[in-house]
């Protein structure tokens, strides 16, 4: 398809010059949050649109048969912020932001970085294969390659979707890392009894209900909580659903971005992120938004959050990872979560 960079969500080209509806995949960077008047480190990451020209389908078996299994060497690998420095940031956020009433929870990231010692596209397809084979419970497993930029990941979380007028949000929070022998009833019960994990989930659900009320005429309905099991982690989640007649681009704008990867309240969270994170987020915590034409007119929207995603630019690998900080957070424990 054709690659088009646009300035605003409303500029995403859902129709051609003759008004014919088109399918578009948009990579929405975190910096688009300025459309809501919120703060951010502006890194000029483009709102990049792939206007779909052709679509092909493969079975998983056929895809795996064609994807490479190369060993991808990484050099100078490690976190850009070490454990002690990250723990210091956590302490400051708890004391200076949460302790002074700026909000109840904030997500602060650091980046795992390395130099990729092979062709970036080969590396991306190799990692994509590994995710297809070994990760489970992902909402989207994807690779997006555009000029000078590659993204590959397995996002567990749908931020927002709009299918036939039904809007769905899926807040996921709380993270249980499976022990070496696997999860047991006892370890899961301990996780579910954690005050910190419970606070995280309730706070993000409350914030997303506010978003639903802004885009849905009926305000939305809530179901859950549920457990979401992945290959090495288990999360807690809720499902929120409501109805809306809004343009899907407007739905996306009014729900930027998920409190599960920013914090709450949303505006304060963006200010705290700008104050305490040392570099721009790029696409981390943004979305990959797929707009698909409906037979009766309009477009459906499917927008997973861009987390659990690796980016390669100019041969440099970056994997942004964050932890949700609440008043009960342990600074070193949050570093371990990343």
What are the residue ranges of the model-derived segments?
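Short, flexible beta-strand-to-coil junctions
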Residues: 1, 28-33, 144-148, 290
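Short conserved micro-motifs at the rims of enzyme active sites and ligand-binding pockets
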Residues: 37-39, 180-181, 215-216, 329-332
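An anion-binding catalytic pocket shared by soluble metabolic enzymes
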Residues: 107-199, 214, 220, 291-321
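Conserved hydrophobic core element of enzyme catalytic domains
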Residues: 241-337
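Non-catalytic accessory segments adjacent to catalytic cores
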Residues: 2-122, 164, 197-199, 217, ...
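Contiguous alpha-helical scaffold segments within structured protein domains
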Residues: 54-80, 115, 176, 183-274
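Conserved phosphate/anionic-ligand binding catalytic regions in large, soluble enzymes, centered on
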Residues: 97, 102, 201-213, 282-285
């Amino acid at each position: 398809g054709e690659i088009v960079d646009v300035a605003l969500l409303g500029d995403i080209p859902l129709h051609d010059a003759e008004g014919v509806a088109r399918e578009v995949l948009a990579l929405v960077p975190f910096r688009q949050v300025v459309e809501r008047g919120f703060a951010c480190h502006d890194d000029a990451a483009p709102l990049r649109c792939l206007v779909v020209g052709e679509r092909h389908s493969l079975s998983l078996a056929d895809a795996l048969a064609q994807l490479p299994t190369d060993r991808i060497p990484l050099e100078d690998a490690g976190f850009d912020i070490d454990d002690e420095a990250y723990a210091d940031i956590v302490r400051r956020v708890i004391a200076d932001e949460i302790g002074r009433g700026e909000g109840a929870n904030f997500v602060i990231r650091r980046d795992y970085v390395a130099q990729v010692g092979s062709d970036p596209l080969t590396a991306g397809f190799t990692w994509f294969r590994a995710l297809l084979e070994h990760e489970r419970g992902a909402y989207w497993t994807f690779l997006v390659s555009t000029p000078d930029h590659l993204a590959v990941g397995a996002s567990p979380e749908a931020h927002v979707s709009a299918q036939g007028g039904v809007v769905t949000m899926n807040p996921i929070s709380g993270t249980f890392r499976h022990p070496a022998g696997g999860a047991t009833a006892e370890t899961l019960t301990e996780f579910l009894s954690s005050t910190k994990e419970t606070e995280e989930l309730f706070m993000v659900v409350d914030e997303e209900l506010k978003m639903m009320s802004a885009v849905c005429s009926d305000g939305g309905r809530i179901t859950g909580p549920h457990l979401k099991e992945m290959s090495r982690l288990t999360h807690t989640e809720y499902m929120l659903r409501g109805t809306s007649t809004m343009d899907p681009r407007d739905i996306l704008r009014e729900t930027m971005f998920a409190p599960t990867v920013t914090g709450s309240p949303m505006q304060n969270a963006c200010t705290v992120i700008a104050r305490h994170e040392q570099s721009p987020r790029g696409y981390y915590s943004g979305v990959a938004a797929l707009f698909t034409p409906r037979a009766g007119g309009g477009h459906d929207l499917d927008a997973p959050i861009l987390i659990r995603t690796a980016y390669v630019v100019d041969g440099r690998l970056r994997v942004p990872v964050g932890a949700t900080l609440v008043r009960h957070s342990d600074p070193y424990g949050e570093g371990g979560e990343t």
